[in-house]
Amino acid sequence: MFRGASAINLDTKGRIAIPVRYREPLQLEHQGRIVITVDIQSACLLLYPIHEWELIEAKLLKLSDTDKTQRSLKRMLLGYAHEVELDGNGRILLPPPLRQYANLDKRIMLVGQLNKFELWDEQAWLQQIDECQETIRSEELANNERLADFSL
């Protein structure tokens, strides 16, 4: 399970180093294979260990190619999807179209989301956190049925 936020750097070749604490589980459970695609709701990337991505692909396979919305979702997620592999130094290469989509430059945030990671431009991440705090403070949280009995 992936949790926590890590500040990392994008090198001049477009690579990032996955933090050491995640490398062993990625290597042992997923042979170091990761699929990167776009988040369709935010300007960030999603990094799925290969076995998690295969579950997403199975869901996408069930979507209709004749329904415009479903086809659009498939095009975005699959069209941007790139499979990468951790190198010997725990790095992965982020393809240019993905870097452009998420406006990734030098400073990046890798954010664990249990079964996947989000990859954000550092400034966009800080702005997103502010927006999340606003949402949590608003009545939207109190009025959300699925969160009615959620307790920490």
From Swiss-Prot:
CDD domains to which the protein is assigned, alphabetical: MraZ_C, MraZ_N
Stretch forming the signal peptide: none
An example Gene Ontology CC term for this record: nucleoid
Main location (coarse class): cytoplasm
Highest taxon listed in the record's lineage: Bacteria
InterPro entries linked to this entry: MraZ, MraZ_C, MraZ_dom, MraZ_N, MraZ_sf, SpoVT-AbrB_dom, SpoVT-AbrB_sf
SpoVT-AbrB domain span: 5-52, 81-124
GO molecular function: DNA-binding transcription factor activity; transcription cis-regulatory region binding
Keyword DNA-binding set for record: yes
GO biological process, one term: negative regulation of DNA-templated transcription initiation
Swiss-Prot/TrEMBL keywords: Cytoplasm, DNA-binding, Repeat, Transcription, Transcription regulation
Cellular localisation: Cytoplasm, Nucleoid
Pfam family, one: MraZ
The keyword DNA-binding is annotated on this UniProt entry: yes
Assembly behavior: Forms oligomers.
Family: Belongs to the MraZ family.
UniProt cross-references to HAMAP family, sorted A to Z: MraZ (MF_01008)
Name of the molecule in the record: Transcriptional regulator MraZ
Organism (species): Shewanella sp. (strain ANA-3)
Name of the coding gene: mraZ
